């Protein structure tokens, strides 16, 4: 509980907001108050090219989204520090982290959340849209 309501943690970079982000946030809002763990610029650079917008610009946009109640800085892809600090009842993350390099991050997040009875919710990604595809189009000059 955070301010008397179930807290739902949603990590994201939110460099290019698209319908998939909105869908994830709407799903998260069904479980409680949404707290976005917005990746810092440094955290994004660990796994993606330079963000188009800096942290403060992205924060302004994310704070304006209807389902979002709180925005906090996510310093790395290691969710444990923020999970321990805020102790959400739920964390919402797309299914892409079940395999590959993020599978260990996922396992750790599940273990940490379980310490206080928290759960991970993994909705399907929105078909036909992704930040990576949109960025490739922008960088390539094709729309």
Indicate where each model-derived feature is located.
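Nucleotidyltransferase catalytic core that binds NTPs
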Residues: 1-143
